[in-house]
A protein has these predicted regions:
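Short glycine/threonine-rich catalytic loop with a Thr-x-Gly-x-Asp
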Residues: 23-30, 42-43, 224-241, 251, ...
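Short glycine/serine/threonine-rich phosphate/pyrophosphate-binding segments
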Residues: 42-57, 63, 112-114, 139-142, ...
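Positively charged, low-complexity intrinsically disordered leader regions
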Residues: 1-28
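Glycine-rich phosphate/dinucleotide-binding loop and adjoining beta-alpha-beta core of small-molecule
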Residues: 2-12, 63-223, 290-297
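Charged C-terminal helix
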Residues: 264-297
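Phosphate-handling active-site elements
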Residues: 61, 245-258, 267-272
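Substrate-binding N-lobe of the ribokinase-like
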Residues: 23-88
């Protein structure tokens, strides 16, 4: 059967309606608790950038599980976040059971296999539903597990999975995830892969595309610019989506809002900057959300 997919461009009018309105009596527990696991001793900055984006996107609470070498720097740069040593197995298991949103991958590294196994098994046995974003090294570890037909991963990446999973690959990561069998320009085959995996796919590129399980619509983001071609942009996007996922009723709305805001802010900065830094984007998130919410469209 030939599947016909329609394309919808993300735009300011549609995005404005997704920005959550905060009641006067709102408190932090209403806006989600995010756990970010990442940042080995060499790549602590990736986790810092993801966390900065999560905090500035409005997450009620943010906890980082990272290499102990990163703790002093994170305490200094991100006093809003809580921190834990990722070698504390019991604490990580308890935190996964406690939070609403889990982001794994920024700066995680490919050799941290024991922690990856712990995360997989804890998620699989979790008693509550999570919104899970897998980014960067987590995608490469996921691809390796799929190639080896890892049973836990096969159960997690299925339509029957209780969790809502978001995958954020760029072109190279997508080749590994799909084992090179699904070209990035074969949209019908990508949609079929997404339907079977039961996961939302953000296929990053010059025009980022969002695929949703069992939907016949591809959401396309036309924004972005060459000034954003710098390390940490993906970490920042993943952090933004994590922060928004705890605030919105629909996970796909958090994805659309995060993807749009990321490039929208980047395009604004690019008007006056040759290079757009991820930290610049994060700092402008609260201002831009307020600005858009007040616009007359």
């Amino acid at each position: 059967m030939v599947v016909t997919l329609s394309k919808v461009d993300l735009n300011l009018t549609a995005i404005k309606s997704l920005i959550p309105v905060r009641d006067k009596d709102a408190y932090k527990n209403l806006f989600g608790h995010v756990l970010i696991i990442g940042g080995n001793h060499a790549m602590g900055g990736a986790t810092q950038m993801a966390t900065m984006a999560t905090v500035n996107s409005g997450a009620g609470l943010t906890t980082i599980a990272t290499d102990s070498a990163n703790l002093p720097a994170i305490h200094t740069v991100l006093p809003e976040a809580m921190i834990m040593d990722w070698t504390d197995v019991s604490a990580i298991q308890q935190m996964i059971e406690k939070v609403e949103v889990l982001l794994v991958g920024p700066g995680f590294g490919m050799d941290n296999l024991d922690l990856w196994q712990l995360i997989k098994t804890t998620i699989a046995s979790s008693k509550h539903s999570l919104r899970i974003i897998l980014d960067a090294d987590a995608l490469n570890l996921l691809a390796a597990d799929l190639a080896e037909e890892d049973k836990t991963i096969q159960e997690l990446l299925s339509p029957d999975n209780q969790h809502e999973i978001i995958l954020t690959p760029h072109q190279g990561e997508w080749r590994r995830l799909s084992a090179g069998k699904v070209p990035a320009d074969d949209q019908a085959s990508i949609q079929n892969w997404v339907d079977q995996a039961g996961a939302i796919l953000i296929l990053k590129g010059s025009s980022t595309e969002i695929y949703v399980p069992n939907e016949l619509v591809i959401y396309r983001n036309p924004g972005g610019n060459p000034g954003m071609a710098t390390g940490g942009m993906g970490d920042t996007l993943a952090g933004m989506i994590a922060g928004l996922a705890g605030q919105l009723n629909k996970t796909v709305d958090a994805v659309k809002l995060g993807v749009f805001l990321h490039s929208y802010i980047g395009d604004q900065l690019y008007e006056d900057h040759y290079v757009v830094l991820p930290s610049q984007i994060s700092k402008r998130i609260p201002y831009t959300m307020k600005e858009i919410s007040k616009k007359e469209l």
